[in-house]
Amino acid sequence: MTKKIVVFTGAGISAESGLGTFRDADGLWERYRLEDVCTAEAWQRNPQLCVDFYNMRRRDALAAEPNLAHKAIACLQDVFPDTQVITQNIDNLHERAGCHNVLHLHGEITKLRSQKNPLDTVELDGWEQHYGDLHPDGSILRPHIVFFGEDVPNFSLACEIASQADIMIVVGTSLNVYPAASLLMYAPAHAEIYLIDPNEPNLTYYADRVGHIQAPATEGVPALVEALIEEV
């Protein structure tokens, strides 16, 4: 019987493609205040600043290239087509690496959405949004991003996917961002869990269940994928 594999990725995997993260010492929060660019209140107060911020991030994301970790996950899906990727990342590096079955928890930088219906999105052509552009429903388009403090629309689906995992691979996340970090709680008792992180993780609740691979994503993911494929 084919094993169900779930890959859960965070900012660290994209950082190895050159994209800035928020929480590192030299991260985005050193240059921008969360309250100014990534909350619903910020959007109401100064939408142009939010648009400019996400235009910058979109330009950077589209200039970045998928790395060996993204490509290894795509190879894993070639062998195990039912493999599901759940990502906290808003870039499209997984898709550009050839991945399918990608669930974005925090939105997608390449899309804009209606302000009346968070799930009603449109693709943006290029990297630049112009504030004031309208959705077909008449509302002003905003970045398709889950702002801090907003509900995560895909979280229930992510929990359902995690609950079906035989193998869960966690890469590029410190497991400090909730509710996404709680996904491990939904993994079945029999599931094998691998955490790929160059740093020693804080695994208070999962230490007895998690196999820690201490390596960067671009080294740890290809090595683990190769091992899983060899078992077939």
Regions found by a protein language model. Name each.
Residues 1-232:
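Conserved catalytic core of sirtuin-type NAD+-dependent deacylases
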